């Protein structure tokens, strides 16, 4: 899709933490896409109650002003597009108010704290003409997009099974203070919402819809954490999640997600095995993926091949200042591609592939996993 007519799109970012800064970086570089030629992206406002942080982020990424509260941008008709990077318990009312004000929005995953909250936001979005999307950024990596195309094109035959993991050690230290991420009411869930939602989306991106959660086990390793009041507080959500899935197309999959993975600051991996081959991806080597096809070569010479994406890969040319094969793309470029997709959707008046409806489906998979863990039985994923 090429954008022909000149247009100015004024954007704002709500939340100046790490995710909000990634959004700001994405907006700042979104104009690199050839398909957005003629579009001027105006970096308007960074919103955060921590005004010093907001000013630092605005200065760093080139935004014109700051605001302490989202109410300061709601009635500004010049601001068309707003990205939101807030804790789960804050994001739902903010996204709802922005949609009601006629803004196009992109929120961070997860979409709310439950399938019910996600459905509420879908209903609000359906009453508007706004683009309403969620930032599942890993699917914007060229290597992941190429891997997905290979599976969908039959390069490994019929998919039989897959496994994915997302490991981090940000919660490994038991002296780390109690925060909203460790509270079930505020977060909706622990690593299952914070991290496993990324792997669920990646697997569905490659294999299609999850049909059933076969089993789920949740575990809290560090059960209490110190609070600002000098007392220790109970951790009420999961540090580790193990999930077994069956896809509507028949493939099986397993997910391991943990925030107490010692020595793994961030490690995401994806593997799909089919009737004639397999694919593998590891985020710590973001600019490559592995393809094995058993019909290429004789036994002993039919080893897996390392594929290095280049300009033919989706998102590569639009995000790379030196778009030559072998130059590495990484997580920063994924956020650039994400914001480019958002702006394309706004200009075209079309939904993104990671729309609220798509993100609500991810939340229904999470709901099924939570029910499976609680009831110790398989749970079919609910339909919308």
For each of these PLM feature ranges, what is it?
Residues 107, 132-134, 163, 255, ...:
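Hydrophobic residues in well-ordered beta-strands that form the structural core
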Residues 19, 138-235, 376:
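Predominantly a Rossmann-like dinucleotide-binding segment in NAD(P)-dependent oxidoreductases
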Residues 1-61:
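N-terminal Rossmann-like dinucleotide-binding module
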């Amino acid at each position: 899709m090429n954008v022909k007519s000149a247009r100015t799109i004024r954007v704002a970012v709500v939340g100046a933490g790490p995710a909000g800064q990634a959004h700001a970086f994405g907006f700042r570089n979104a104009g690199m896409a050839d398909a957005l030629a003629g579009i001027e992206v105006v970096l308007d406002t960074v919103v955060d109650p921590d005004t010093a942080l907001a000013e630092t982020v605005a200065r760093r990424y080139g935004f014109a002003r700051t605001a302490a509260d989202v109410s300061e941008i709601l009635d500004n008709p010049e601001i068309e597009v707003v990205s939101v990077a807030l804790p789960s318990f804050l994001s739902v009312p903010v996204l709802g108010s922005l949609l009601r004000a006629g803004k196009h929005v992109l929120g961070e995953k997860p979409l709310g704290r439950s399938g019910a909250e996600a459905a509420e936001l879908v209903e609000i979005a359906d009453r508007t003409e706004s683009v309403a999307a969620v930032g599942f950024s890993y699917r914007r990596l060229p290597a992941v997009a190429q891997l997905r195309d290979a599976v969908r094109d039959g390069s490994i035959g019929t998919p039989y099974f897959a496994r994915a993991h997302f490991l981090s050690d940000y919660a490994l230290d038991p002296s780390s203070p109690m925060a909203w991420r460790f509270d079930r009411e505020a977060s909706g869930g622990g690593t299952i919402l914070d991290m496993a939602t990324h792997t669920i989306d990646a697997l569905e991106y490659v294999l299609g819809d999850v049909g059933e959660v076969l089993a789920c086990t949740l575990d809290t390793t560090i059960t209490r954490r110190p609070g600002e009041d000098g007392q220790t507080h109970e951790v009420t959500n999961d540090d580790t999640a193990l999930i077994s899935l069956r896809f509507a197309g028949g493939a099986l999959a397993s997910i391991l997600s943990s925030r107490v993975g010692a020595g793994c600051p961030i490690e995401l991996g994806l593997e799909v095995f089919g009737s004639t081959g397999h694919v593998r991806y590891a985020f710590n080597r973001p600019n490559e993926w592995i393809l094995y096809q058993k019909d290429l070569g004789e036994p002993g010479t039919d080893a897996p091949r390392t594929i290095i994406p280049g300009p033919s890969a989706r998102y590569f040319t639009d995000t790379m200042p030196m778009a030559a094969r072998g130059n590495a793309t990484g997580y920063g470029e994924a956020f650039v591609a994400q914001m480019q997709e958002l702006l394309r959707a706004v200009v075209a008046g079309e939904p993104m592939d990671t729309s609220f409806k798509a993100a609500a489906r991810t939340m229904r998979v999470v709901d099924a996993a939570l029910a499976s863990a609680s009831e110790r039985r398989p749970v079919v994923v609910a339909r919308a």
